[in-house]
From Swiss-Prot:
The protein's Enzyme Commission number: 4.2.3.5
Keywords: Amino-acid biosynthesis, Aromatic amino acid biosynthesis, FAD, Flavoprotein, FMN, Lyase, NADP
Reactions accelerated catalytically: 5-O-(1-carboxyvinyl)-3-phosphoshikimate = chorismate + phosphate
Similarity comment text for this entry: Belongs to the chorismate synthase family.
Source species: Pseudomonas syringae pv. syringae (strain B728a)
Binding, FMN: 125-127, 237-238, 277, 292-296, 318
Signal peptide (from-to): none
Entries under SUPFAM superfamilies matching the protein: Chorismate synthase, AroC
Subunit: Homotetramer.
Source lineage: Bacteria, Pseudomonadati, Pseudomonadota, Gammaproteobacteria, Pseudomonadales
Name of the protein this chain belongs to: Chorismate synthase
Amino acid sequence: MSGNTFGKLFTVTTAGESHGPALVAIVDGCPPGLELDLQDLQRDLDRRKPGTSRHTTQRQEADEVEILSGVFEGKTTGASIGLLIRNTDQKSKDYSAIKDLFRPAHADYTYHHKYGIRDYRGGGRSSARETAMRVAAGAIAKKYLASQGIVIRGYMSQLGPIQIPFKTWDSVEDNAFFCPDPDKVPELEAYMDQLRRDQDSVGAKITVVADGVMPGLGEPIFDRLDAELAHALMSINAVKGVEIGAGFDCVAQRGTEHRDEMTPQGFLSNHAGGILGGISSGQPIIAHLALKPTSSITTPGRSIDVDGNAADVITKGRHDPCVGIRATPIAEAMMAIVLLDHLLRHRGQNADVSVNTPVLGQV
């Protein structure tokens, strides 16, 4: 199976299945001398891990990460950083009834046709369990980017039909939804409680923002920064759409509205989401991602078995009724991996570039 590595200079390779003994990652290209300890990684892993509220899967995984290499006396050495998280709460028997069935809207059918063999336990390699390693690797990238003045944060901006206006970052870490509006939390909780009673699932929208990014990151033509961000975010399980800045709303905008006019005091708007011509402008980089409802629900769904016979599928086991609830740290991680990769690429070619034009902020 190819396609397990992301990045060019800062690279992340992951391996492991949902019900295998462990998940692993190799992170290569991290600059030496970065102070790094387990807590730097564990902090974000704890934000993503399952079983932290009644609104997520009740699978109990500590997601305790081990650093196997690349860190000595509390600092990165420049060597590959090996990471490991052991799986401890697998219940594979929950999936024995569907081992020869294809869950509708899941990767079962496509994996079967592509490889001719698949690990049906918890979705195997296609499970979102894999994203734990992305979060661990992304935490390394976030730590280095923070040393360069770049801060990456995310929040839930919609759950099902409920739009969530941004009010304050202070609220995001105080609830299970990463919700930036504390007044919306009771409505979200009530909606999720009813969803469980309905034995159904729902989608969500996540917004992720990078502040402090300098102008110049991005490699036209084919490695535009927004193209690579879209690639990274679309690679997250259940993501079916990505927008940068105004995204699809720009269709209804006129040029006089959409263009981000500049004054000596700064940009007057940020419809471009901080990226112009595939290169960062120095404004906040803003991306939105849409996650579909999970297909692993207990309401029967029509499908087929491996022989093509009609079948009704009921997925037992422990699943997230809304995968978007735990997606914010994953989106942050993928944005961080992209930005650090492009920061290192920019240094390699353009470290000596200097212009007299001031760097504009946001008015």
